[in-house]
Amino acid sequence: MKVVHVVRQFHPSIGGMEEVVLNVARQHQATSADTVEVVTLDRVFTDPSGRLSAHDTHQGLPIRRIGYRGSSRYPLAPSVLDAIRSADVVHLHGIDFFYDYLALTKPLHGKPMVVSTHGGFFHTAYASCMKQLWFQTLTRISALAYARVIATSENDGDLFAEVVAPSRLRVIENGVDVQKYAGQGATTPGRTMLYFGRWSVNKGLIETLALLQAALKRDPQWRLIIAGREYDLNESDLRKAIAERGLQDKVQLSMSPSQEQLRALMQQAQFFVCLSRHEGFGIAAVEAMSAGLIPILSDIPPFVRLASESGQGVIVNRDKIEAAADQVQALALHADNDFDTRRTASMAYVSRYDWKHVVGRYIDEYHDALGIPRVQEAVR
């Protein structure tokens, strides 16, 4: 069986969806005799002037890149039809042009397809009314072309239940590479928060600066590290926001750090902070907990569930910064006394998200889409 993953961004782009595709494909390839390929666009959205090679390999996975026109919000790439020609099963990632176009053209290509939701397209408030109309019409109709719609979180499951029949909707929460940063967080108590991920308005970075400002009134030892890559906020935007709040000596920016550099930053931090407005799942929070960082998270459903089930960290309201700062300071004071216990508990909880426990469910979906039983195979 050959499975072709179709995703708008992949290596060398870095992000949550890219990480999921990498791990599903890599684990599938490692545990079966099946063939796996990734089809993606030939430009990284944050550097659209640079065109990438049409064929590549990343961590043993073959990559085919295709051109596109239009914006990064809805890139038009009809040549995807040729790119999936050799597939037995197509696994779409995200609700975008590929999702709609491959559904529309299914009578032409005839490929069995499954799709992972990855939060849909509700990550920001941009064009929210139009998005709702699109979701209730085109997204609903396109879903009929897919053998299975795989919601990547309980939150997505509730959302897509509005437009997908229960018989074709399944929740498979994302796995996470919990070994990548395992145990890399600081081993002694302190007052350093770390954010890593996209530099996006959606991620609540401006609110995070406000939280730091309020926390410093309670304890002058607080620091913040913001690591990641530019998105709709760039380095200049963040430095301006930092300067406006007089936080130049309290905030460290690290743009596009390597994994080794991010590990080094984690070693300086005790807490992971993310005041995101929306997450389909929240991979970075799980990765941070695998490092032993204690989470400080916004009150959105995936984060509330993560904090509730793990019993770790605090959930704050990013619109009530003073109250949030009180919670964060109280958390730090408690952690001064039992930091090692909290650190160990965070790491232990997220072991359940290891990809080795998750990938078999995806392989089952591929076989169901083909209508053939799965034969268990020994790991190669």
Swiss-Prot record:
EC number: 2.4.1.252
CDD domains: GT4_PimA-like
Cysteine pairings via disulfide bonds: none
Reactions listed under catalytic activity: beta-D-Glc-(1->4)-alpha-D-Glc-di-trans,octa-cis-undecaprenyl diphosphate + GDP-alpha-D-mannose = alpha-D-Man-(1->3)-beta-D-Glc-(1->4)-alpha-D-Glc-1-di-trans,octa-cis-undecaprenyl diphosphate + GDP + H(+)
Keyword field contains DNA damage: no
Similarity annotation: Belongs to the glycosyltransferase group 1 family. Glycosyltransferase 4 subfamily.
Function of the protein: Involved in the biosynthesis of the exopolysaccharide xanthan, a polymer that is comprised of repeating pentasaccharide units with the structure of a beta-(1,4)-linked D-glucose backbone with trisaccharide side chains composed of mannose-beta-(1,4)-glucuronic acid-beta-(1,2)-mannose attached to alternate glucose residues in the backbone by alpha-(1,3) linkages.
Protein name: GDP-mannose:cellobiosyl-diphosphopolyprenol alpha-mannosyltransferase
